[in-house]
């Protein structure tokens, strides 16, 4: 069964400026638990460009602390990327209140993102790498992915339709490519500018995707993300 990763307060932060009350987050986590969601990405943990943004854009350990006792089996995490990553912000899983980190890897930063993934795994975190703008990855990017010797440490390798250019018929070519490169778990992050978020995600699920991303009411950057209610209806 495919796992669900909710990123309402991370990707939805583009609409809400990453400012949420503890009460809202707690209520949201209860909703996710009730719907058998496996992962909640509650914000970014970014080091740069933080001025004027809410606390879930920085989302250091103390921001996540209030939710440690209510999440139960739900895994909580954050996203970072190569440009905004500060290793000192990640103190190690044993001293942190998040379970996983997802690293956004733009096509020209794949090698650096994989190195960060290794560092975070060695600190005890579960680690995802998300390949952004997947249709523009070049030969060097694919070579780095193929040659990387620590593929097995990833919870999953995500590919993202960052600019909502993919159609359902195109999902398989990327999914199968990453399988050939040697990645066991492959996941998909949709955007909905063209109205294909659900269809593209279902195409990935039918191929055997480890997880797909959702938000409540489809909130997210630009055209938004896959609405969790649409996915749950389709899976049921």
Predicted regions and their residues:
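Catalytic alpha/beta core domains of metabolic enzymes, predominantly
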Residues: 156-236
């Amino acid at each position: 069964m495919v796992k669900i990763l909710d990123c309402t307060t991370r990707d939805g932060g583009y609409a809400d400026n990453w400012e949420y009350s503890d009460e809202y987050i707690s209520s949201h986590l209860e909703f996710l638990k009730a719907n058998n969601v496996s992962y909640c990405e509650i914000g970014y943990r970014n080091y740069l460009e933080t001025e004027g943004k809410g606390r879930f854009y920085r989302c250091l350990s103390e921001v996540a602390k209030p939710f440690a006792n209510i999440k139960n089996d739900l895994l909580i995490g954050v996203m970072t990327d190569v440009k905004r990553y500060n290793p000192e912000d990640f103190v190690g899983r044993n001293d942190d209140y998040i379970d996983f980190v997802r690293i956004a890897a733009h096509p020209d930063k794949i090698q650096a993102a994989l190195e960060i993934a290794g560092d975070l795994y060695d600190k005890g975190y579960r680690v995802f790498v998300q390949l952004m703008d997947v249709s523009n990855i070049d030969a060097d990017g694919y070579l780095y992915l193929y040659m990387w010797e620590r593929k097995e440490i990833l919870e999953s390798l995500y590919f993202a339709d960052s600019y909502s250019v993919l159609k359902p018929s195109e999902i398989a070519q990327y999914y199968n490519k990453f399988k050939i490169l040697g990645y066991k778990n492959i996941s998909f992050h949709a955007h909905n500018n063209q109205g294909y978020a659900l269809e593209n995600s279902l195409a990935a699920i039918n191929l055997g995707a480890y997880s797909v991303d959702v938000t409540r009411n489809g909130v997210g950057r630009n055209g938004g993300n896959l609405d969790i209610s649409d996915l749950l209806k389709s899976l049921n």
